Amino acid sequence: MSFKSINIQESAQLISEGTLVVDVREPGEYNEAHLVDSVLIPLGEISAEKVNQANPENKKILIHCRSGKRSKVAANILVNQNYAGEIFDMDAGINGWIESGQPVVSDN
């Protein structure tokens, strides 16, 4: 099993299909701006078990961070832990998402 890095348009398509979005940034970053209905699991806490709790049906997940570095690390952790679902990595992160005009929400 491996993961696939995808662009913003492909990410938006997956989200429109109901794919679970996992944000691996820190809580402060998440509170400033995050994707609607995303689940926060910081990189230091990421595990197949935690993702399974958020996504019990093992459907597709889309992982993102700020710029695409932490999300790739998180995806590799899940691959190494034999996560059963399909794993996608938003290669431009939330910065690319915002730059492309896609919506975000804030908890601040």
Locate the predicted segments by residue:
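Rhodanese-like catalytic fold shared by cysteine-dependent sulfurtransferases
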Residues: M1-L20, P27-K60, S71-N108
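Short, surface-exposed ligand- or partner-binding patches at beta-edge/loop junctions that are enriched
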Residues: H64
